[in-house]
A protein has these predicted regions:
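Alpha-helix capping and helix-loop boundary segments enriched in small/acidic/polar residues
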Residues: 7, 52-56, 125-126
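Short Pro/Gly-enriched beta-strand edge/turn motifs at strand-loop
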Residues: 2, 47, 192-193
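Exposed, low-structure sequence patches enriched in small/polar residues
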Residues: 78-103, 107-459
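Hydrophobic, small-residue-rich alpha-helical packing segments that form membrane-like cores
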Residues: 15, 20, 28-89
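Outer membrane beta-barrel
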Residues: 1-37, 138-161, 431
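Secondary-structure boundary elements
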Residues: 21-26, 66-71, 99-104, 214-218
Length: 459
């Protein structure tokens, strides 16, 4: 049995009880408890990126069965979620199978979600929201090479471009407690992690392919390709009907800008020198994404886009059994703004691009140097700079924050053992998206201050 209690000021807190029963090849898990999530959204008033204004309290209970059968592992799960404040109830079910074979492994998962909202004493009718999701992945090993591929098709709650980001009124959205399958390659570099793409469980079709293999006895190569889009291509009306949207279904990722496409190509080389005391990792990354579909009519096509090119480098030197030094450098070039095309009946279309920044290209640099002693002590110095910071364009930016386009920090940490670590930090952090273990969360900027972190793992 397990009792869990955790509450965070600006994330997700939970209290609950978990029980597990094992017998032969079967495992049953039962959970029950409540979850409180806090987010900040522009849909509601009093928006402040550092202060939550949207609160959701849920009571959950469910069970999961896992069974080893015919050299495979099959599983089924259901989860019931109640939200009293919003008079909402959700039912989630899942079926999955994991089957290893001689030269690889296959995994498949299907999920369904039903959301019902009670109208209470009002005459408002709330339709039942039904959503589904499918995910499959396959890994194959050929001599020293491996290839992994996956396909996902999530349609938990598909909404048109005018309402898709309204987390308050879209009561059929995927829940915060739902987690998407992790990507094959998780970026360990600062700038690349910040530009990672989160899987949209509500509406996304995607594929991923990764190829890994040796180039020599000391060097390896990794090729990663990701492509995803909305499950629909969206079209807007004209004139008085400009706010009305329609869509055509996509069953494979689309490159059409009206489908919120995302595409990433990442190539990495890594390995050791002949003496084995120097490890290197260097790569190239290209990303393209359409964030918003503003208009896609016979008159005007307008999209918010982002392109980035990143060069990451990491070198680790083992000086002796006690000391090692690591150097990390990232160079990034970003283009973000609005692409607009005004269509003409005479064939002379007007194309334009409006940058979201004062410059056409944002240039980011991140440099970090760390030293480790005896696997106990670590010392870190980092510096990040840009020629234009998009956060400074927000009129609600707190005036107490430094408007300089650079962030520097120094930290020292001591590891008492594998479960106890103490860190003292001074300086600034730019903030942004941070993805670890397949979960992404937004880190708020930290400006010229002191932070003390103590982490403890309790078995």
């Amino acid at each position: 049995n397990q009792l869990n209690y955790q509450n965070l000021d600006f994330d997700t807190g939970s209290r609950g009880l978990g029980m597990q029963f094992d017998k032969d090849s079967a495992v049953i898990n039962i959970i029950m408890g409540d979850v409180s999530s806090r987010t900040s959204t522009t849909v509601l008033g009093n928006f402040d990126p550092r202060v939550p204004n949207h609160f959701v309290d849920e009571f959950i209970y469910g069970a999961d069965l896992s069974l080893d059968i015919l050299k495979s592992t099959a599983g089924a799960a259901f989860l019931l979620v109640d939200e009293k404040e919003r008079s909402l109830s959700h039912v989630l079910t899942n079926f999955r199978i994991d089957r290893p074979y001689e030269s690889g492994e296959f995994f498949m998962s299907i999920v369904s979600k039903t959301s019902e909202k009670d109208n209470g004493m009002t005459e408002i009718f709330y339709e039942t929201k039904d959503g589904v999701g499918f995910y499959a992945s396959s890994s194959s090993y050929i001599k020293n090479w491996s290839i992994t591929s996956s396909y996902r098709n999530f349609k938990i709650d598909v909404n048109n471009p005018a309402t898709r980001d309204n987390i308050v009124h879209n009561y059929g959205n995927a829940l915060n407690i739902q987690r998407s399958p992790s990507g094959f390659y998780e970026h360990t570099f600062r700038l690349l992690s910040r530009s990672s793409k989160e899987v949209n469980l509500n509406d996304e079709v995607g594929i991923e392919i990764q190829l890994l293999g040796p180039l020599s006895s000391n060097g390896n190569i990794a090729l990663n390709y990701i492509k995803s889009s909305s499950s629909k291509q969206w079209y807007s009306g004209e004139g008085p009907l400009a706010g009305q949207w329609s869509g055509d279904n996509n069953f494979i990722p689309s490159s059409s800008q009206s489908s919120y496409p995302f595409e990433e190509v990442f190539v990495e080389f890594n390995g050791y020198n002949s003496n084995g005391n120097i490890f290197y990792k260097v790569g190239l990354d290209f990303q393209y994404e359409v964030f918003n579909v503003l208009s896609n009519s016979a008159e005007v096509k307008s999209y918010e886009i982002k392109e980035s090119f990143t060069f990451p480098l990491l070198v680790n030197f083992n000086l002796n059994p006690l000391w090692n030094i690591e150097l990390q450098l990232e160079l990034q070039k970003v283009k973000t703004g609005f692409e607009t095309t005004i269509l003409s009946d005479f064939g002379d279309n007007n194309h334009s691009f409006t940058s979201l920044l004062p410059v056409k290209y944002q240039k980011n640099i991140f440099l970090a140097l760390s030293t480790n002693y005896n696997q106990k002590w670590s010392f870190n110095v980092s510096h990040e700079s840009t020629n234009s910071d998009e956060l400074l364009l927000d009129s609600g930016q707190d005036e107490s924050f430094d408007s300089a386009n650079d962030w520097s920090s120094i930290s020292m940490a001591y590891k008492f053992d594998s479960d106890h670590t103490l860190e003292l930090f001074y300086g600034s952090i730019r903030g942004g998206l941070d993805c670890t273990n397949g979960v992404c969360r937004y880190i708020q900027a930290f400006d010229d201050g002191i932070r003390i972190d103590y982490s403890l793992n309790i078995d």
